[in-house]
Amino acid sequence: QLNATFYSGTCPNASAIVRSTIQQAFQSDTRIGASLIRLHFHDCFVDGCDASILLDDSGSIQSEKNAGPNANSARGFNVVDNIKTALENTCPGVVSCSDILALASEASVSLTGGPSWTVLLGRRDSLTANLAGANSAIPSPFEGLSNITSKFSAVGLNTNDLVALSGAHTFGRARCGVFNNRLFNFSGTNGPDPTLNSTLLSSLQQLCPQNGSASTITNLDLSTPDAFDNNYFANLQSNNGLLQSDQELFSTLGSATIAVVTSFASNQTLFFQAFAQSMINMGNISPLTGSNGEIRLDCKKVDGS
C-alpha cells in the first residue's frame, strides 16, 4: 500500500530535492515538465508504475525506449538521472526511480501554475522492461476515442480520468508526425480533418508540409503553451485541439467526454481537483511494493548489471 510518508524517516527531503532539480532544469528547458509527466504516464500504462520505461537495452532487456510511442519522443531521462544522483548523494539506496517519476510529475505541474497534490510513495522498480507492452498498451494520438477509452479502462481509469489526464496537453510540444495525418488526407478522405479549426489548419500545413520533416515540433496548447491551466479544454471547444486524440474528446458525437470537457473549460478549479485525483489514480496502477522489485541505484539499469 502506497502512502504519503513512506520516506519521512529515511529521506525526508526527497520531495524537495526532486523539486529543486526540476526547477533548475526548467531554466534551460521550458518543456521539461511536460516531458517528465509523460514518462510517468508511459511508464504506468505498461505493467504499472515500475520505472520500466527508464531501463536501457542490455542483455535480456529490450528497452521500452524503442517502442513506437517512445522512440524519438520520450525525453527527460537526463533530468531523472540528475534527480537520482542528488537523492543518492543524500540518502543512498532509498528512493526508487518509479517514485521519482511520480514526484517529478507533481513538481512539474505545480511549478507551471497547476495544482499540487500529496504524492503517495513506496513503489519499487522493475527488474525487466516490456517492449511489446509499450507498443500495445499506450494510447496513440491516431486512435479513436473508443480505443483510447478501452486502454484507460484496462488499467482501471474511467472517462473522467481520461479527460482530466488529457488536460496535461495544456503544456508541452508534439511533432508533426503525430498530427500530420489530420492535415491533408485524413482517414483516406483526400482532405483535412473536418474537426480542425481552419486557421490552425493553414498554419499547421505551412509548418508541416506533406514531404516535410516529421520531427518539427509545435505547441500542444496554442494559447498558453508553457502554463498548466484549463485553456486546453477551451481550445477543444473551438476545434483547436492539436492531436486527433485531443479533439475527439469534444467532437465525438454523443460521447460522455463532451460534458466533462465543457465543465473543465468553464471551471479551472474543478479541472485542477479532478487532475490531481486522476494523477493519484494513475500513480496507483499495479505498483511493486514490499519485497517485489528493487530500488535501482541507477535508473537506466537493473542493480548488479
UniProtKB/Swiss-Prot annotation:
UniProt remark on cofactor binding: Binds 2 calcium ions per subunit. Binds 1 heme b (iron(II)-protoporphyrin IX) group per subunit.
Pfam families reported in the protein's UniProt record: peroxidase (PF00141)
Active site: 42 (proton acceptor)
Protein residues bound to substrate: 139
Binding site for Ca(2+) 2: 170, 221, 224, 229
Glycosylation, residue list: 3, 13, 147, 185, 197, 211, 267
InterPro entries the record matches: Haem_peroxidase, Haem_peroxidase_sf, Peroxidase_pln, Peroxidases_AS, Peroxidases_heam-ligand_BS, Secretory_peroxidase
Keywords: Calcium, Disulfide bond, Glycoprotein, Heme, Hydrogen peroxide, Iron, Metal-binding, Oxidoreductase, Peroxidase, Pyrrolidone carboxylic acid
Residues engaged in binding Ca(2+) 1: 43, 46, 48, 50, 52
Protein family membership: Belongs to the peroxidase family. Classical plant (class III) peroxidase subfamily.
Function field: Removal of H(2)O(2), oxidation of toxic reductants, biosynthesis and degradation of lignin, suberization, auxin catabolism, response to environmental stresses such as wounding, pathogen attack and oxidative stress. These functions might be dependent on each isozyme/isoform in each plant tissue.
PANTHER family for the chain: PEROXIDASE 53, PEROXIDASE 72-RELATED
Protein name listed in UniProt: Peroxidase A2
Organism annotation: Armoracia rusticana (Horseradish)
Lineage: Eukaryota, Viridiplantae, Streptophyta, Embryophyta, Tracheophyta
